[in-house]
Amino acid sequence: MWNNFFVFILLLMSAVSCVNVPENGTIAAYSVSEDTVSVSIRGNVPVSGEWDAEWIHRYAADVDKLAERAAADSREEIDVLFFGSSSIRLWRGLEEMMAPLSVVNRGYGGATVRDILVNYDKLMAQYRPKAFVVFCDNDICGNQVDLSVSGVLDHYRLLFDRLDQDYPGVPVFFLSWKYSGLRAFMRDKQRLVNSIMADYASGSEQVTFVDVNSTLLLLDGDINPELFESDDLHINHDGYLLWTSMLKPHLMRVCER
């Protein structure tokens, strides 16, 4: 009965054993078969859910293109790997804005933290960055497969733990979820996600919360429409310049530039 479904399973234990658990009991990768996905991780992170296989792989072609692009890139050591959803993918001029840092853009449109976890190996490829930047705010956008606010935190904890296992000591910069006119009806949940993620980061040596959303707001707390594209969802060049002004000093510091 589980055909065409991907199942995310996490047992609540101090050291969890699902599939592909290393002998030392630390986090293991997602294990993907024809109709299941399982997770193994150490720690206390309860996560469960079911998603249609077609949905979880809806951007497989885009992810494959990123993998092909990485295969053609001879670099391994870079300064910063950016990944996440369309707000990363559409960051035109990222290399110039972040210069002299060497950066790689691994964003793809519509990404959620769930399919980032599934596509993790393809997204990270061969790169060994000094820092990660992630922006991905599609797990709560008003559709039937939305996560709860607590579910967003749980899945990001999975992602952060996997990064810490594979890239020990490498900092992760989490960009706050941005408000937009198109998703104004989601603002209370977006605000709560930002509050929870900021609180999480405050107790983490790995994760830094960067409140880029604040750069897009007017004094009354509403969004500045002059910083958005006509779709009322994505930011424009001026918006990215503001994000850069807030984020780049952090990256220059950790990359020792």
Question: What are the language-model segments listed below?
Answer:
Residues 88-104, 115-153, 173, 177-181:
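Oxyanion-hole/transition-state-stabilizing segment in secreted/luminal serine hydrolases
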Residues 72, 78-93, 111:
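Catalytic nucleophile-elbow at a beta strand-turn-alpha helix junction centered on a G-D-S/GDSL motif
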Residues 1-80, 96-99, 254-256:
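N-terminal secretory targeting modules
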Residues 167-171:
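A short helix->loop->beta-strand "cap" motif at the edges of active sites that frequently abuts
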Residues 82, 103-105, 209:
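Conserved beta-strand scaffold positions in the cores of enzyme catalytic domains, especially
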Residues 120, 156-161, 194:
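Generic structural signal for well-ordered alpha-helices
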Residues 179-257:
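Catalytic His-Asp segment of secreted/periplasmic serine-dependent ester chemistry enzymes
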